[in-house]
């Protein structure tokens, strides 16, 4: 018997290998080197790996422009414009999250490289999901991402809430993973393959003899993804986990996890199951309505800002799903733009929440934000801009992101769905504006000024720049994601 070694295109794998390599290097150094790896060194390695990934992306984009999209490792990994954009967004998100975590770790007196080892490994899982062209590889990336996050959520062992959140996330996450892999097995039974390209080819050229298997498998896959993006009714873990996790980890969950999950969801529903559009659209229709309305409505009664942002994130996921529902190239580009611009804005928002939370990460009542913009105009003003961008206020990037997903939905015949989403945005405006006005309320005489470390200040500044600059001038990112969509899967 001849052993067939699959062709490996290492340029396609470089980002994933870099993150895995950096994580392993930090782990080995922590275990084998006598002098303890400092938090400065660990942050430096994380940022360096992310910058290397961004550099690789230029070479990957150039290769795709000249040779077209390609697959590698037995067609299980894809290199296309879509994956390049996803990799860059994840790499930038890792840099911003690492900088916030760096200052948080110093404040909480957390030494060593453990946090960054886990963050790098989890990010490698997200990259794997972005580039996956096979259901098994998506599951592998999902598990690598999830396992790292389970530990990160419970990283603050001094707080019982952190351990409780980790246990909840682990139990429900394991349940969702089991549902996903069972769905993959059913799709394999119906089509004879787990490769997304092969599934698409089979469904385009054959009559499905077992449609029940295919529909059941697709539904289970969708449930698995719905859990990861916190779509209603699979969102119940989100508020408790957001509240209990260390705040920098919450920022990772609101950004990097969404990028990986939505990238994989788009590949499965648009690339593999695109011919079954009329089958999965009604399910997604219901999910979007529930996600938009419940996310915005329940956020109204929240006094804890981390729980409020959890429900805000649920509402944002509903808008992102609109582009998926459209099932068109325009919808894919709109979702990609939304995710790419939402990530730095939400990380910057959680950076402010990390600062206001103070030592012990406990001060998360909205009352602690009263008069913040009066005491510290720069910090309060920055948070106001970030909140208005998530609201979708005109002249912010959030406005353009919401506009293009709604336009894609209406073009695909989803006027009623777009109307419900708009109504949910109107509801969400209440809690976003209430929080913003609270920042400028009469100052609390007992409140103290918030210390703003340099690296966290940079992260907040980047979020504000993205919110304003690309709100006024969205063209560069919009053009980039449109080109990436044209190069979506060979």
Describe the function of each predicted region.
Residues 1-490:
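Alpha-helical transmembrane segments of multi-pass membrane proteins predominantly involved
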């Amino acid at each position: 018997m001849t052993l067939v070694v699959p062709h490996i295109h290492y340029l396609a794998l470089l980002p994933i290998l870099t993150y895995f390599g950096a994580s392993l290097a930090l782990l080995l150094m922590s275990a084998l080197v006598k002098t303890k790896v400092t938090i400065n060194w660990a942050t430096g390695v994380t940022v360096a790996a992310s910058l290397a990934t961004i550099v690789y992306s230029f070479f990957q984009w150039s290769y795709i422009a000249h040779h077209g999209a390609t697959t590698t490792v037995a067609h299980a990994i894809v290199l296309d414009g879509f994956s390049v954009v996803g990799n860059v967004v994840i790499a930038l998100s890792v840099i911003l999250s690492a900088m916030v975590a760096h200052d948080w770790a110093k404040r909480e007196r957390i030494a060593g490289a453990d946090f960054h080892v886990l963050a790098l490994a989890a990010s490698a899982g997200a990259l794997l999901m972005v580039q996956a062209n096979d259901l098994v590889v998506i599951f592998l990336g999902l598990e690598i991402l999830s396992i790292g996050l389970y530990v990160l959520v419970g990283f603050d062992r001094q707080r019982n809430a952190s351990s409780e959140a980790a246990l909840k996330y682990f139990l429900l996450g394991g349940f969702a993973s089991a549902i996903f892999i069972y769905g993959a097995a059913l799709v394999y039974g119906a089509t004879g393959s787990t490769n997304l390209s092969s599934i698409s080819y089979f469904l385009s050229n054959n009559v499905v003899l077992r449609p029940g298997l295919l529909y059941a498998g697709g539904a289970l896959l969708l449930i698995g993804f719905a859990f990861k993006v916190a779509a209603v009714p699979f969102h119940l873990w989100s508020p408790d986990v957001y509240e209990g996790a260390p705040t920098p980890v919450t920022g990772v969950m609101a950004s990097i996890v969404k990028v990986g999950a939505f990238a994989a969801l788009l590949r499965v529903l648009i690339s593999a199951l695109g011919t079954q559009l009329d089958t999965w659209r009604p399910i997604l229709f219901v999910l979007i309505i529930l996600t938009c309305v419940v996310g915005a409505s329940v956020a109204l009664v929240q006094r804890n800002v981390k729980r409020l942002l959890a429900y805000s994130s649920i509402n944002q996921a509903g808008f992102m799903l609109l582009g998926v529902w459209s099932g068109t190239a325009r919808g894919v580009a709109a979702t990609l733009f939304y995710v790419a611009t939402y990530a730095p804005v939400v990380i910057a928002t959680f950076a402010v929440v990390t600062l206001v939370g103070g030592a012990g990460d406990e001060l998360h009542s909205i009352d602690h934000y009263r008069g913040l913009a009066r005491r510290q105009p720069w910090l309060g003003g920055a948070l106001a801009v970030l909140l208005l961008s998530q609201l979708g206020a005109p002249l912010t990037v959030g406005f353009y992101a919401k506009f293009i997903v709604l336009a894609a939905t209406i073009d695909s015949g989803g006027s009623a769905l777009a109307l419900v989403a708009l109504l949910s945005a109107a509801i969400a405006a209440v809690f976003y504006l209430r929080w913003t006005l609270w920042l400028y309320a009469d100052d609390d005489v007992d409140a103290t000024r918030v210390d703003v470390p340099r690296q966290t200040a940079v992260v907040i500044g980047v979020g504000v720049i993205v919110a304003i600059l690309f709100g006024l001038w969205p063209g560069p990112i919009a053009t980039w994601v449109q080109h990436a969509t044209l190069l979506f899967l060979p």
